[in-house]
Amino acid sequence: YFPVSPYAFCAGNPVNLIDLEGQDIWEINSYGNIVRHLKTTRSDAFFMVDEYGNRMIGDNYSIEFPYKTVVQQNSYTYLDDEKGINSYDVYRVRGDKNGTALFEFLADNITGSPTKVEIGQIMTGLEGDKGLNFITTSHTERREAGLMKLIRGQIGYGYTIREVNHSHPKDAFPSGLTGSDEQGNGGDMEAIKLLTNSMISCGAKVASFHIYHVPTKRKIPYSVKS
């Protein structure tokens, strides 16, 4: 699920830690942390690494995109109620197919691992090759704080948000349907209600919301009426 941020929709701005341009290689561990970052002008690529930092073997553990597909990578810090100071990573990816491919690659390898760390995807702008996708992770088991914080802290202002997706390691339904999730929060249902109301109050079209269910690789829609 993605917990609620204290940042107001259409306002607020977290602290920017890292601002990296594209044309890179990223080596990522099962928590979604960037273990190594290598500069290259050949392509944009991601490799999963094991607990020792070694690249994992197999076609499912790497993905490659044309040069400058990843427009930018940023990391932000925030105060988490449970973990204290925490951070979340954001990859800005050009093109809906590319953004979805990276989102599902990271979800399959990270959310689908024993860490159960969730991944988020925000699809903005024009649909198709010109769309700008934001792929997020806050490196936390069964939670994705980056989605909510990014929307309410930055891209809720000045971006047309078309779709908001996040991964689930097990449940094929949104958290919070019974009032609270395992952590005692309103979970996905509280978040979608707040975001929907915020979009309406800002005069924006309400985005569509989906869960990417990793065990079945299905994209499951949900709404405030779920």
What is each model feature region?
Residues E118-L126, H210:
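Short beta-strand scaffold segments in enzyme catalytic cores
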Residues T69, Y78, I135-A145:
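Structured interaction and signal-relay segments at domain junctions
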Residues L20, I25-K39, A145-S226:
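Active-site-proximal loop/helix of nucleotide/amide-processing enzymes and allied scaffolds
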Residues T77-T100, E104:
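Charge-patterned, phosphorylation-rich low-complexity C-terminal interaction regions
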Residues P6, V117-I119, V206:
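Extracellular structured ligand-interaction cores
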Residues P14-V15, T41-R42, E127-G128, H168-A172:
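Acidic glycine-/aspartate-rich tracts in secreted/extracellular proteins
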Residues Y1-Y76:
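Short turn/helix-capping motifs enriched in Asx and small/polar residues
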Residues D108-T115:
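Short consensus segments that form the blades of beta-propeller domains
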